[in-house]
Every structure is written in structure tokens, then in C-alpha cells.
């Protein structure tokens, strides 16, 4: 089913984006802590 495939890909992309944002936020917090 093409619609199901598109929905699955969209969900994966959304998940990767959220993971990327979370990793970036953690790295920023670590950098701020180290600088102090």
C-alpha cells in the first residue's frame, strides 16, 4: 500500500528529526556545563 509506505516514511523522518534535536540540545548543555 503506497499510502501506508508514505506514512511510515514520514513517521521515521519525524522520529529522526526529534532524535537529532534531542542530541543537539544535549550537546549544547554539555558544552555549556564544560565552559563553566
UniProtKB/Swiss-Prot annotation:
Entry's Gene Ontology cellular component terms: chloroplast thylakoid membrane; cytochrome b6f complex
Transmembrane helix found in the keyword field: yes
Disulfide bonds: none
Subcellular location, record wording: Plastid, Chloroplast thylakoid membrane
Record field: transmembrane: 6-28
Keyword Ion transport: no
A single BP term in Gene Ontology: photosynthesis
Alphabetized InterPro entries for the sequence: Cytochrome_b6-f_sub7, PetM_cyt_b6/f_cplx_su7
Keywords: Chloroplast, Electron transport, Membrane, Photosynthesis, Plastid, Thylakoid, Transmembrane, Transmembrane helix, Transport
Main localization, broad class: plastid
Role summary: Component of the cytochrome b6-f complex, which mediates electron transfer between photosystem II (PSII) and photosystem I (PSI), cyclic electron flow around PSI, and state transitions.
HAMAP family from the UniProt entry: Cytb6_f_PetM
PANTHER family the record matches: B6F COMPLEX SUBUNIT, PUTATIVE, EXPRESSED-RELATED (PTHR34951:SF1)
Identification of the protein by name: Cytochrome b6-f complex subunit 7
Lineage: Eukaryota, Viridiplantae, Streptophyta, Embryophyta, Tracheophyta
Gene name for this UniProt entry: petM
Amino acid at each position: 500500500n503506497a499510502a501506508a509506505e508514505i506514512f511510515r516514511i514520514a513517521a521515521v523522518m519525524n522520529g529522526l528529526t526529534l532524535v537529532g534535536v534531542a542530541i543537539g540540545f544535549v550537546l549544547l548543555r554539555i558544552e555549556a556545563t564544560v565552559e563553566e
